[in-house]
UniProtKB/Swiss-Prot annotation:
It comes from Rice stripe virus (isolate T). The keyword RNA-binding applies. It is found in: Virion; Host cytoplasm. Its main location: virion. Belongs to the tenuiviruses nucleocapsid protein family. RNA binds at residues 43, 46, 76, 122, 240, 269. This is Nucleoprotein. GO terms for molecular function: RNA binding.
Length: 322
């Protein structure tokens, strides 16, 4: 044990006070250095360029085919399929090709401590346009939490995990969206979906380890990760806009958002957001202008909330702006 250990309670309290005083003085004098350090260590998601480099190095002439097959694996069987392939369980036809892909690219079932690990989920998000076509054209795709689970009936196409790649936030800080943009609709939907799916699928041990056993902590965690994803520059603004319009196409007529999306959002408010505690709803209300409406009116009827959402969109300039 070090010789600097305080001998008495009074010594301990004095040491804490002295170090705190010195640390606060340092922060005051060197705030710029601390801010720079914070920016350097802040989690910013995986390095897409690193992943692309690995994929191109290992893929060669079959890269396009391989990515299509990997993304198909992700949406037909889920990210846990990698474990099945590795253990040679629950896999019949197609097992040889699946095993080859997992081995070739070093695909793992979860990120773990490797910030740039290659998972099926990351591949799907890295190539959102491919993912969009896979879920549209291939039967048997599934998600752990669908739109009916959120009271957002009929909106499954909005919930796929690649969709946040298309979202463009309006602000660097909360509230992240304030206008009636298509991004705003998708952002609100994914705040709730990312929370619900993580709460359902994350093992209890990991929740305790990360301090996520309370809804408010889980909501802050999942929203934080969503914001990081939305800020991704992997796609150009033009490609993001094209993606948003593809995803929301069925909810837009003549450049205007259909009332069906208003009703769906209202359903999410009264059926799902209403089940959250006050602290969680207060946090949600701070994230965007539309979410504020949904989080603060959960005691109203779905028809009333739908009317409020409709008013929000009509108060803005006409049209489904992007």
């Amino acid at each position: 044990m070090g010789t600097n250990k305080p001998a008495t309670l009074a010594d301990l309290q004095k040491a804490i006070n002295d170090i705190s005083k010195d640390a606060l003085s340092y922060l005051t004098a060197h705030k710029a250095d601390v801010v720079t350090f914070a920016g350097q260590i802040e989690y910013a998601g995986y390095d897409a360029a690193t992943l692309i480099g690995i994929l191109k190095d290992k893929g060669g002439d079959t890269l396009a085919k391989d990515m299509t097959m990997c993304i198909t694996m992700r949406y037909v069987r889920g990210t846990g399929f990698v474990r099945d392939v590795t253990k040679k369980v629950k896999v019949a036809a197609g097992s040889t090709e699946a095993s080859t892909l997992v081995s070739r690219y070093g695909i793992v079932s979860s990120v773990g401590t490797n910030a740039n690990a290659i998972t099926l989920g990351r591949l799907a998000q890295l190539f959102p346009n491919v993912s969009h076509e896979v879920v549209r054209q291939i039967s048997g795709v599934k998600m752990a939490v669908d739109s009916s689970d959120l009271g957002l009936t009929g909106c499954d196409n909005l919930l796929w995990d690649y969709v946040p790649q298309y979202i463009k936030l309006e602000s660097e800080t909360a509230p992240y969206c304030s206008t009636h943009s298509l991004s705003h609709i998708l952002f609100v939907v994914h705040i709730i979906h990312s929370f619900q799916i993580t709460k359902k699928t994350m093992p209890e041990g990991k929740k305790k380890e990360r301090g996520l056993t309370k809804d408010i902590d889980m909501m802050k965690y999942t929203t934080g990760l969503l914001v990081i994803t939305c800020k991704s520059k992997n796609l150009s603004d033009k490609k993001k806009e094209e993606g948003r319009k593809k995803v929301l196409d069925e909810f837009i007529t003549n450049g205007k958002v259909k009332t069906t999306i208003f009703d769906a959002l209202a359903g999410m408010s009264v059926n799902t957001i209403s089940t959250y505690g006050n602290q969680t709803r207060l946090y949600l209300a701070q994230q965007s202008k539309l979410m504020k409406i949904l989080a603060e009116n959960t005691s109203k009827t779905a028809t009333e909330v739908s009317g409020l959402v409709k008013e929000f969109f009509e108060d803005e300039a006409e049209g489904a702006d992007d």
